[in-house]
């Protein structure tokens, strides 16, 4: 059946742990991971709950293909009500932690309440225990993992933890595993910190052996891996260059948000690109990139391992940052770089290391810095207030802000609120490039119309991974659509959103969708699970998950007015590139999107839609 069939319920207030049987009826309807975890959350949590209160819950959930031999089967999702947005938060991570939990015999962990003191959860197959984490509180993600592996005398234990950002309530704090893989968005780490939960250490030795039809599963996964290997993106581009290969591509078409979205092209893009990562540095003749790295069971291996110049001003006399470590991804390179006009690759790598070490989302952090730099250049913020000179392009300011925010010091406390709260506090809310309070990723909605609609309607706030229309609008996958045209984009966005929900819930990585469709996922799930997951059924399940998340947000107080974009994208035309003179056509697309979804004009699923999806 592929599901382990068991979940852990941890009451942090009482300090108790109990085992429950997985709800198999829900598993049939929502698969696992994002979908199934969200079903538990929306059933058990009041949508109007304070995200940082003991009444909120936080869930770690794997999918039925997590821990199996399916390519990219290392994913898990952290689900909660997010403090950055007040909406449902489903944040996905790779690495090895998810597979380890599944191999220990667990599908999911539900945490409720709040511990009176710092604790961590230790899982060794069926042995589960809450343990004191007083000695870990205040430690970085890296130190926490080091100490736990040493004290448990097990170098193979996998750790999912928070750093100082989560402890200090940074509203976009991340949950980090394997040192630099993260459930990074929406502030799931802040919820973890609010519960005095420092880490989950897992050791699993059982394996995942309950495959419905092992021979059929082996056959279909082999066939699907072959498709990945032969695809230009998953078999060549991502392994060789990683996601950062998009930097020059997106810049050339005029879709790279620059200086807090004032511009759509960055003159320094080439300096922070994937090509720059493999070019020897002038300072020491060494390349930034050391090698690529794969998550559990992944045949793509898009991860980057890089090494900084030891003489760069950010790491002089800081040997802890000199070794090979988790490298830049495209989104982080953009948010720390182009979004702020910074083209110092070493400074970007340093800020990214701090995001990993302290446990915070580099997208929201970098985009918030962009808003701060604009407020500084406007004269709204001064050096005396923020501690440094912070014009656009300042690598020194970027590094200083990363240190302040991660440690919860000085003006870093305000940067930790996110751009929506910060810009509102200083009288310029329109300068927050966010949706529902969550900062934009690395694509401009004026130059790529579909992604703008995807941002506006995302259930967790601005997000590219909830409906990655870039595949179609830029890369031509599975079909090429014109990025500056709005016709057909509502239907395109819906299709991507629903398919992504199904992939996220399976336990596989969304990057497989560069080569696969839902029709490729279906036979893998059918061979693994004791259910008939046809292509049509998976598409319907994806749509069901999307609408379930939407209804939680509606009940939390979100309405159609929250499906919007910043004023800048709706009224300030792009200055250069293919979209020169254009703004987002969201007002034209949104009503058509609602119609395609089967929602009323207020963005609520109709009775007919609810009945069709069995909500």
Task: Locate the predicted segments by residue.
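Intrinsically disordered, low-complexity segments enriched in small residues
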Residues: 1-92, 96-615
């Amino acid at each position: 059946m592929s599901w382990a069939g068991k979940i852990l319920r941890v009451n942090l207030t009482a300090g108790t742990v109990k085992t429950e049987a997985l709800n198999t009826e829900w598993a049939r309807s929502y698969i696992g991971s994002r979908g199934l975890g969200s079903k538990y959350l929306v059933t058990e949590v009041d949508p109007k709950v304070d995200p940082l209160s003991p009444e909120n819950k936080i869930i770690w959930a794997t999918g039925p293909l997590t821990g199996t031999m399916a390519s990219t089967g290392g994913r898990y999702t952290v689900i909660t009500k997010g403090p950055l947005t007040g909406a449902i938060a489903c944040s996905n991570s790779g690495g090895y932690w998810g597979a380890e939990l599944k191999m220990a015999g667990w599908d999911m962990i539900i945490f409720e309440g709040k511990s009176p003191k710092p604790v961590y959860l230790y899982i060794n197959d069926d042995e589960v225990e809450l343990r004191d984490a007083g000695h870990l509180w205040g430690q970085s993600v890296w130190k926490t993992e080091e100490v736990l592996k040493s004290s448990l005398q097990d170098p193979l234990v996998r750790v999912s933890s928070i750093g100082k950002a989560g402890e200090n309530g940074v509203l976009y704090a991340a949950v980090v595993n394997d040192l630099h893989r993260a459930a990074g968005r929406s502030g799931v780490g802040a919820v973890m910190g609010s519960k005095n939960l420092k880490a989950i250490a897992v050791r699993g030795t059982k394996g995942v052996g309950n495959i419905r039809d092992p021979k059929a599963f082996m056959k279909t996964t082999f066939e699907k891996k072959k498709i990945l290997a032969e695809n230009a993106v998953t078999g060549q581009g991502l392994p060789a260059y990683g996601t950062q290969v998009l930097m020059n591509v997106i810049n050339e078409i005029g879709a790279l948000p620059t200086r807090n979205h004032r511009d759509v092209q960055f003159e320094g893009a080439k300096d922070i690109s994937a090509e720059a990562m493999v070019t020897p540095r002038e300072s020491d003749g060494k390349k930034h990139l050391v090698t690529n790295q794969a998550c559990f069971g992944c045949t793509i291996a898009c991860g980057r391992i890089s090494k900084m110049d030891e003489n760069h001003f950010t790491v002089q006399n800081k040997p802890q940052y000199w070794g090979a470590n988790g490298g830049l991804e495209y989104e982080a390179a953009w948010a720390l770089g182009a979004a702020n006009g910074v083209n110092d690759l070493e400074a970007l790598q340093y800020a990214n290391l701090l995001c990993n070490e302290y446990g915070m989302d580099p997208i929201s952090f970098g985009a918030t810095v962009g808003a701060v730099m604009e407020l500084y250049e406007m004269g709204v913020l001064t050096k005396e207030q923020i501690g440094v000179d912070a014009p656009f392009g300042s690598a020194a300011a970027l590094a200083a802000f990363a240190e302040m925010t991660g440690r919860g010091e000085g003006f870093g406390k305000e940067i930790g609120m996110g751009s929506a709260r910060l810009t509102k506090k200083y009288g310029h809310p329109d300068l927050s490039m966010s949706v529902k309070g969550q900062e934009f990723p690395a694509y401009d909605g004026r130059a790529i119309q579909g992604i703008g609609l995807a941002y506006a309607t995302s259930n967790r706030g601005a997000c590219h991974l909830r409906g990655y229309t870039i595949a179609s609008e830029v890369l031509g996958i599975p079909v090429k659509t014109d990025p500056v045209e709005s016709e057909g984009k509502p239907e395109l966005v819906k299709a991507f959103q629903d398919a992504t929900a199904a992939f996220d819930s399976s336990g596989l990585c969304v990057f497989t969708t560069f080569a696969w469709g839902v029709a490729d996922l279906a036979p893998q799930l059918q061979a693994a699970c004791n259910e008939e997951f046809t292509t049509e059924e998976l598409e319907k399940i994806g749509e069901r998950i999307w609408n379930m998340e939407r209804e939680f947000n509606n009940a939390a107080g979100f309405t159609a007015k929250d499906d919007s974009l910043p004023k800048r994208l709706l009224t300030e035309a792009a200055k250069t590139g293919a979209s020169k003179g254009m703004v987002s056509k969201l007002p034209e697309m949104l009503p058509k999107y609602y119609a395609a979804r089967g929602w009323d004009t207020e963005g609520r699923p109709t009775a007919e839609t609810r009945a069709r999806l069995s909500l």
